[in-house]
Amino acid sequence: MAAAPRACKGHGRPLPVLLLLLLLALPPLGGPPGAAAYFPEERWSPESPLQAPRVLIALLARNAAHALPATLGALERLRHPRERTALWVATDHNADNTSAVLREWLVAVKGLYHSVEWRPSEEPRSYPDEEGPKHWSDSRYEHVMKLRQAALKSARDMWADYILFVDADNLILNPDTLTLLIAENKTVVAPMLDSRAAYSNFWCGMTSQGYYKRTPAYIPIRKRERRGCFAVPMVHSTFLIDLRKAASRNLAFYPPHPDYTWSFDDIIVFAFSCKQAEVQMYVCNKEVYGFLPVPLRSHSTLQDEAESFMHVQLEVMVKHPPSEPSRFISVPTKTPDKMGFDEVFMINLKRRQDRRERMLRALEEQEIACRLVEAVDGKAMNTSQVEALGIQMLPGYRDPYHGRPLTKGELGCFLSHYNIWKEVVDRGLQKSLVFEDDLRFEIFFKRRLMNLMQDVEREGLDWDLIYVGRKRMQVEHPEKAVPRVRNLVEADYSYWTLAYVISLQGARKLLAARPLSKMLPVDEFLPVMFDKHPVSEYKAHFSPRDLRAFSVEPLLIYPTHYTGDDGYVSDTETSVVWNNEHVKTDWDRAKSQKMREQQALSREAKNSDVLQSPLDSAARDEL
């Protein structure tokens, strides 16, 4: 009997047929297992992902019309599905139009979010036991605690997974903040918010009576020298509660716990509630999440509060994009002015568009009108152009830190200021304000400078130049305070020309010195002209040296960056030698001394005799 032919020998094709059947039974390439099968009844669809958690955002606002456009705009940009987000908003005791702003926004967005609960109260406009709108009386504390408790109850009643509390002046600029906090899987967790000073929305220590306690752990966390999520005794202002956690059922804002004996303060009452429920609070500083203002004193005004929040927006722009307002709110039109000066100049290199845009926005926020002056780009000047202007370096000049001659960048900087002095004289401008473009403003800048100039005029002070921002180089003894004028001292040897006020008389004196024929950096030239430069050889080339120079104290302007900071760029120090474009001067920026932060002054050298204004104390950091 003949044997059947073997398939492997090619006699017949049973193997390919079997392979084909097997391939048909397999799911499509890249498809999930079981998504396809030989028999229709064996096919099934993959499971869909989980829906985003349900979140209720609770916002309490009082006298916050100035902050709400930016705060609400930031909330709109949170990357969490709006259909899974509910809004709970309350406002009362307002002396401004907070209710109208919130109503306009809620009407516009109510169809975008899962639900909206709106709790306005138009009357009364103040608490009976408060001394002013910034004073926290017992009745105000109690009312806020009741509102937070009501928001918490609403979240529980709607079976929300989380509740996010946000103060009306807190800017959550990181759109992933909510997602990142949820991922931490903590019962109570806060994003660390930045401010202009050491203040933030957490404590690292608490006394036995429930008050704030300084600890060595605070500053490393606040400065992000240590990064992570840290167990702390207190978080406030902006924080997330995970309502899925069993322990969250024992948390309450009001009434205070039966064992509570500490100060009647809403944040301390809630911290005690967490402690009694054995719920640990956490603060996370892994990323930059947002910003908040430093609290003002109880006697501060609504104007102080509005300007304080505006300063938060200015601080944001130093290293981040500006905080844009909600597109659903009508923002009041700004009316810039020149602060009483004949002209406000802002110097900017054309190729530094980022600085120009930031400074123009910062001035607009403060309602300061300026004239943009295109800076002289020293790096773009060739030797023949320098010679055509009759420029010669001061004989014997060497940079005090590197021993190098003048750079093209320093030459361009000098010419930029020189051209402004010429314009001041040509136009007969009695007093002008000059800004460079790499500066940051102190809080209440506009009001404090205007008050200072009013004092100067009232006293009839004979002045030529007033530093608004500088680096004080003479640190052995204090500078002389000006009698009867607040916040002003006679300037000693100083660096930097970040911002200054110049008079017509002062500009004439600077031009009369014919500085182009014996040039040195502009911030070395000015101390020579008011006879405070420590190098007598430099001073010998200029006479008279009778510039009447003063300085604001405390300063109202500081640099945006110092040597070694991320983003530090120098257009003056990193350049080429003034008369030879082939000799580079790109020094090690990390070792540059000129742009280092002002060194700490000894107690004996501080300008402690200067007359202070009320705004100075309001501007101090609470910590």
From Swiss-Prot:
Gene3D superfamilies: Spore Coat Polysaccharide Biosynthesis Protein SpsA, Chain A. InterPro entries: Collagen_mod_GT25 (IPR050757), Glyco_trans_25 (IPR002654), Nucleotide-diphossugar_trans (IPR029044). Its main location: endoplasmic reticulum. Residues 589-623 are annotated as: Disordered. It is an enzyme of class 2 (transferase). N-glycosylated. Residues 1-30 form the signal peptide. A motif (Prevents secretion from ER) lies at residues 620-623. It catalyses: (5R)-5-hydroxy-L-lysyl-[collagen] + UDP-alpha-D-galactose = (5R)-5-O-(beta-D-galactosyl)-5-hydroxy-L-lysyl-[collagen] + UDP + H(+). Residues 589-607 have a biased composition (Basic and acidic residues). Belongs to the glycosyltransferase 25 family. Beta-galactosyltransferase that transfers beta-galactose to hydroxylysine residues of type I collagen. By acting on collagen glycosylation, facilitates the formation of collagen triple helix. Also involved in the biosynthesis of collagen type IV. This is Procollagen galactosyltransferase 1.
